Amino acid sequence: MRTISIILPFFKYKHYFKECLQNLAQSTFKDFELIVVIDHPTEDIDDLLEEYNSIFDMRIYTLPEGVTGVAACRNVGIQQAKGAYLYFLDSDDYVLEDTLQNMIKAMDHDVDMVNGVLNHTWNNKANYLHKVENKEVDEEDQEEREQRRLNKLSDFVSFASYEKDEQQAQAIFYTMDNRRGIRTFTVLGNLYNRDFVVRNNFKFNENFRYYSDMTFMCPLLEKLNTFLRVEDAVYVKRKHNDPINEPALSQEENDNRFNERCDAVEYTRTLLKEEGVVRFCLDRKIVSYFVSKMSKRIRRSQDDLWRTDYFERIAKTIDGIRPEVMNRYKRNSKKMVACLQNRDLKGVQSCVRRKLGIKKFFRVFKNKNVLFKLAYYHIYSKKPIQDNVILFETFMAKNYSDSPKYIYEYIAKNYPGKYKCVWALNDGHEVPYGAEVVKRFSFKYAYYLAVSKYFVFNVRQPLWYRKREGQVFVETWHGTPLKRLVFDQEEVTSASPKYKQQFYRQRQEWDYLVSANPFSTKTFRSCFMYEGKMLEYGYPRNDILYWPNKDEIAKDLRKKLGIPEDKKTILYAPTWRDDEHYGKGEYKFTLALDLKLMMEKLSDEYVVLLRTHHYIADNIDTTGLEGFVYNLSKYDDISEIYLISDICITDYSSVFFDFANLKRPVLFYTYDIEKYKNQLRGFYIDMNTEVPGPLLYTSEEVVDAILNIDQINEEYKERYEEFYKRFCCYDDGNASKHIAEEVFK
């Protein structure tokens, strides 16, 4: 007989299931049987089951027709289990290598349940561990964290009047009371004595799709006598970073979810002692849900259900709470619940107003930057839209550049006086042709977000922006995609784990999206899930590369920057790395290219123009490289820099798609390509066979390629021509004109 029976339901998302099995195979504890219960999947997983059947002691069961849900799967698993202990594992989650080993050691004390640590993540195991090692996950000092928990536990024991059995109190605290909300109340992360479960006939109620865990856990906690907590047994609960296309069960949008929550609470109450601590904690959870979550919907939601049917439904559920549950709530919350029990909708709304008003006051008190958002929502958005106002923004107002710049200048020159143009720019930038300049996230910025008719942005709009009827949003984007974007990314390792969810809402506000080539059109449809109008005219920012006076512009710029006339120029333009960041929109960057070596070998003939991505927050130290390296990272317009560049070196930046319009040599310094391709983003094209230049992995190879650039040009001549036809086919110097004529009619 195996020691542990791991019960693993599978419904959908084969790629998560595969990772779950891969991680389980790495467990240091091997004495377990794996019971896989399949719930009518739409994907073929036979190959996975066959592969891992040879690795695990695996038994496979399928739910019969008419039976579905994780509760049913787990019940089958309990019935079929032969191990001494039970462990529930969801197919999109994973455990760390020593988790099971550390839990089974605790079972030497012959306890009913061992409770481990339940952590949440948006990432796969490799990226989760990377973030833990780099302290990007909330890993507080264990002693301090445990002391705080013990203080809360002591408070809980006293509050619940349950001093008579501290082990049971600890179990209730760690698995129920210390977890926020009802959704986080779960059977996961615990090891159960199977004899204890079977003897007491604990089961999951199969009528509940979302909240069956409480129907198993609450009766179990009430009967539990012995318990141990193990800090180094980690279960990792994985949130899906694409809740639009691949929602986890906890992320599903379902009209019945609210009613099921109430039904599950009311059903579970019937299994519990009326005066027991578990019932007390369950009641407190439903009250907290109403006070902190649902009450705001009653006030704010446009759906009247929250003020009619749902209001009556939650009132019925809360009618059943014990009066002492309310003892520790604040006065306003007590009043809110009393109004609910009296079916006083206006009274509840008044309490919510007061609560939100106080919260808003303290938000403003702590951060005065909140004020302009309040002005946007409550004042500016009620003003009429001004039909002649256009708001422009590039790279979160960091500079005056990119496609919005060229569209603006075309409008300013060809429609003088017709439009009032406003630029969002920080750091005191000046704009030609008389545009008004406003600072991003200022009162004036909020004002123009509310009243402008047109928007021309090359990045996403602020999350707090709400497009009004009659407004027109032109999204130019900022490059032909090499790296996989948004919904084409399997793993999101950037600063915001809700990236896909946020992007989905933001892209719904776009009326036009600019495309530089047929490849971009197809890719943007997929990665942005965009169904709106495409402006397939090339990138306005590339217009300058076709202007008849481009050589004169280049000559003037070289002179302005002080670049010696007798030196050729090498543009080095690296991009950012998703997993190396300080915060939202601020990324770390360590220069891997040996500029000192380049100076030693190339300075007689070349100088280097360094231009990092606008997301990179680090300043690159070029001390000792004066006269050879010109750091142009703060120079606004990279399109102008292209004109003075004889060679371009990049990695995975989209600059080479634009630079190729000049048909000048491109080299790719791809020292970390395997990590970038396999662990971070992945690519849309094969860099080994499709890019118009060689992949180089060391600084020495880069230097050698530059010294032999004529040979490189000849070697990549045919591929470069194919690349040009494929990716530069729309650019002809007139993109700004075509877009202006179509949008600003």
What feature does the model see in each segment?
Residues 22-31:
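Short, acidic, metal-binding catalytic loop of nucleotide-sugar glycosyltransferases
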Residues 299-383, 391, 409, 413:
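Membrane-interface aromatic/basic loop that binds lipid-linked glycans or pyrophosphate carriers
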Residues 94-231, 235-256:
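Donor-binding/catalytic cores of nucleotide-activated saccharide
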Residues 399-413, 527, 540-622, 696:
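Conserved catalytic-core segment of nucleotide-activated headgroup transferases in glycan assembly
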Residues 86:
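Short aromatic/hydrophobic "clamp" motif used to bind/position activated sugar donors
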Residues 373, 482-582, 719:
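A nucleotide-sugar donor-handling region in carbohydrate enzymes
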Residues 64-81:
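Glycine-rich, basic loop-to-helix element that forms the pyrophosphate-binding segment
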Residues 654-727:
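Catalytic binding pocket for nucleotide-activated donors in carbohydrate/polymer assembly enzymes
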